[in-house]
């Protein structure tokens, strides 16, 4: 999702010498394949957006896989970029790197100040490792490797799998299927109280290209809107966009996840960037993408 959005943004801005690889074409967990790719292509600027991702269920059921796969692919790409003289690399992490009870909104400086959220600790530790490896290469070898920490993302090419997707695409699929089947109610996990922030993926892509051209530094840059809503409010908004008119119930025996996740985006704003897509508009665009690409629901 993120990689394709960055390609769209680069093309929109007139860039033409763009090299991409799908997972089928290049397995980033294979060190030999990654090294061969960098030795052959010698990319000067690298956006590292690839990751093994998933929602609460996937993270809880595959802790070791999430940590191993993400650490391996990150280290393979970042190290091969350094070995082959890459001029600049941009590493994309996640807001889950910040402590569970971090002061809100979360500033970049609160990294590693207290305990992580247990439901996605493995993924968070892997992302922190990638971020720190970029920082240490900068300090030891004078590289220009930067990192961006996005809030919850959504948009075209999202993963709508019923158990392995994040909350917003999962809600889109559930309410679409409920509407199509004529269901009178939908039950959601938790109690709907957690506060979340959402950024349309094309807005993130715009920031990524902006930072590649305008920012250098060891400290990461938060990517978000600076606006939040409860999961209950999000659920009602998705139901409204899709046209589901039944009852929404909550199963409080299921986990809520982190109680609040709002990024402080003042750093990005001071650099001259702000988001463009409001949440309801983005959900409509995402639902159109879901309807136009039904096979995505099978992933």
Task: Outline where the language-model segments fall.
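Short aromatic-enriched loop/helix-cap "lid" or pocket-rim segments at secondary-structure transitions
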Residues: 101-104, 158-162, 234-235, 260-261
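Conserved short acidic donor-positioning loop in nucleotide-sugar-dependent glycosyltransferases
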Residues: 95, 171, 226
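Hydrophobic alpha-helix immediately C-terminal to the catalytic Tyr-X-X-X-Lys motif of short-chain
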Residues: 129, 133-137, 167-171, 234, ...
């Amino acid at each position: 999702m993120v990689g394709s959005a960055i390609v769209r943004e680069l093309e929109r801005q007139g860039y033409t010498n763009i090299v991409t690889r799908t997972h089928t074409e290049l397995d980033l967990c294979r060190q030999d394949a990654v090294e061969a790719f960098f030795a052959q292509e010698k990319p000067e600027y690298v956006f590292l957006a690839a990751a093994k991702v998933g929602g609460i269920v996937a993270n809880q059921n595959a802790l070791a896989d999430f940590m191993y796969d993400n650490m391996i692919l990150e280290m393979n790409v970042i190290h091969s970029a350094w070995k082959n003289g890459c001029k600049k690399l941009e590493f994309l992490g996640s807001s889950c790197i910040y402590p569970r009870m971090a002061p809100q909104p979360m500033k970049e400086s609160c990294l590693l100040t207290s305990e992580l959220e247990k439901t996605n600790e493995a993924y968070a530790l892997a992302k922190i490792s990638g971020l720190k490896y970029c920082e240490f290469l900068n300090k030891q070898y004078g590289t220009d490797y930067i990192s961006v920490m996005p809030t919850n993302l959504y948009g075209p090419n999202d993963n709508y799998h019923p158990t392995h997707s994040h909350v917003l695409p999962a809600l889109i699929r559930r309410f679409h299927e409920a509407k199509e089947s004529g269901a009178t109610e939908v039950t959601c996990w938790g109690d709907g109280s957690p506060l979340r922030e959402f950024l349309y993926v094309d807005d993130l892509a715009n920031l990524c290209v902006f930072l590649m051209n305008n920012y250098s530094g060891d400290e990461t840059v938060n990517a978000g809107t600076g606006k939040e809503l409860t999961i209950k409010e999000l659920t009602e908004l998705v139901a409204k966009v899709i046209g589901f008119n039944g009852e929404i119930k909550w199963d409080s025996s299921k986990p809520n996840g982190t109680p609040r996740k709002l990024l402080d985006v003042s750093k990005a704003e001071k650099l001259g960037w702000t988001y463009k897509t409001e949440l309801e508009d983005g959900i409509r665009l995402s639902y159109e993408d879901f309807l136009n690409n039904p096979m995505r629901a099978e992933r």
